[in-house]
């Protein structure tokens, strides 16, 4: 199955290729910022919260979805999570390079999950993208990422990677501790992402 995602596409022109880019965990350091906020939320020294986590953050003492939702809601509404994350190294550089080469960058994120907070979530997202110099052609707020019609996807969520690949879509898994079980293609850095995209279209 791993080699399936190395197959080259010889029918695409760079100027027509849309790259669907996840935001949290791919462009923005979601887990790094959440760790800071969780330290405050649980009133625990940050050194007690491991940097290496699994999906659901059980390593920080979260035992059920309700606890995760409470922490996440606090992070978003009270600590401006969407506008306070650091950029993942290389995201700005290589997305700008891909954009300059004619690829269309489509940012795809599922952030409209808190009722009556949509306008703020959108504004924080746009402000973050602009302040970090992340280029994009489109910005899509959607849960089902297969619906956005990209040619290449960069994603870190194990569920989303499986769903996209299940539809036969070329998907690069941006590696972190939550998705180590996911097969190739895997990128350990944004330079890896860039090299994989170039290999796919060359």
Swiss-Prot record:
UniProt organism field: Chlorobaculum tepidum (strain ATCC 49652 / DSM 12025 / NBRC 103806 / TLS)
Spans through the membrane: none
Top-tier EC class: hydrolase
Protein name (record): Putative 5'(3')-deoxyribonucleotidase
MF (Gene Ontology): 5'-nucleotidase activity; metal ion binding
InterPro entries membership: 5'(3')-deoxyribonucleotidase (IPR010708), HAD-like_sf (IPR036412), HAD_sf (IPR023214)
Pfam families recorded: NT5C (PF06941)
Keyword Magnesium (UniProt): yes
């Amino acid at each position: 199955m791993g080699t399936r995602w190395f197959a080259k596409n010889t029918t695409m022109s760079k100027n027509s290729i849309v790259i669907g880019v996840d935001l949290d965990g791919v462009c923005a350091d979601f887990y790094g910022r959440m760790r800071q906020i969780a330290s405050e939320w649980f009133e625990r020294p940050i050194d007690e919260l491991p940097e290496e986590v699994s999906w659901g953050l059980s390593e920080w003492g979260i035992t059920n979805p309700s606890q995760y939702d409470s922490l996440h809601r606090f992070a978003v509404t009270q600590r401006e999570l969407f506008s306070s994350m650091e950029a993942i190294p290389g995201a700005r550089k290589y997305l700008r390079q891909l954009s300059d080469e004619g690829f269309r960058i489509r940012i795809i994120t599922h952030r409209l999950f808190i009722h009556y907070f949509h306008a703020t979530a959108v504004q924080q997202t746009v402000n973050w993208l602009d302040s970090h110099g992340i280029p994009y052609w489109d910005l899509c707020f959607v849960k089902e990422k297969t619906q956005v019609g990209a040619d290449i996807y960069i994603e870190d969520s194990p569920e989303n990677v499986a769903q996209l690949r299940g539809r036969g879509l070329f998907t690069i898994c941006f590696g972190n501790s939550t998705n180590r079980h996911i097969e190739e293609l895997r990128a350990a850095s944004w330079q890896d992402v860039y090299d994989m995209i170039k290999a796919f279209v060359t």
